[in-house]
């Protein structure tokens, strides 16, 4: 059945307008973004199929461009719109955290950093720069690497901390392989950065690792001392 023939309260777009986006399923939200289906498949069936094949909404939005463009109903324009939406979401979250009077706890920091890094398909390393009251000054991805490694240069981290006049910072990087467990290289790098930043009176409060599950705090797990 064509989706236009459905009762209004069951159509994703009308449902969103009447009841709010929060009540929609992932497939319904994606259907609203896609706008239309393809021959023989309405837009909701198309959205459901995409989520099944890619393994979920996050996996679909973060998939390689070539893989997405192979799907029926997804052209370059639609792909660009989806990527723009993803970036808008990240920037909205980034703006919210910058406006915060202070970080309200480690859990909020982990949620924020996960949202900023989880889409990356290669390993990246970033810093959340903080003032003396641990209020956010800026977040930057400083280094990008391959699927399993990003080269980090302590001198550049120090330079960016000075540029932002930071009193403290939180290091972060992702593990695209999925595991959040720190490697020995991760631990050694963190200790090296702590020593270097201490020379300019900048504290390293934590190093957060983003994998497939919950973000890992190296401080909370005893790998380093804040």
UniProtKB/Swiss-Prot annotation:
CDD domains in alphabetical order: MPN_DUF2466
Protein's name in the database: UPF0758 protein PputGB1_5335
Signal peptide: none
Pfam families assigned: RadC, UPF0758_N
Species assigned in the record: Pseudomonas putida (strain GB-1)
Keyword terms, alphabetized: Hydrolase, Metal-binding, Metalloprotease, Protease, Zinc
Domain of life: Bacteria
Keyword Nucleus tagged: no
GO BP annotation list: proteolysis
The keyword Repressor is annotated on this UniProt entry: no
Ranges where the MPN domain occurs: 102-224
Motif (JAMM motif): 173-186
Binding site for Zn(2+): 173, 175, 186
Family: Belongs to the UPF0758 family.
NCBIfam families hit by this protein: PRK00024.1, radc
InterPro entries linked to this entry: MPN (IPR037518), RadC_JAB (IPR025657), RuvA_2-like (IPR010994), UPF0758 (IPR001405), UPF0758_CS (IPR020891), UPF0758_N (IPR046778)
Record PROSITE patterns: MPN (PS50249), UPF0758 (PS01302)
One Gene Ontology MF term: metal ion binding
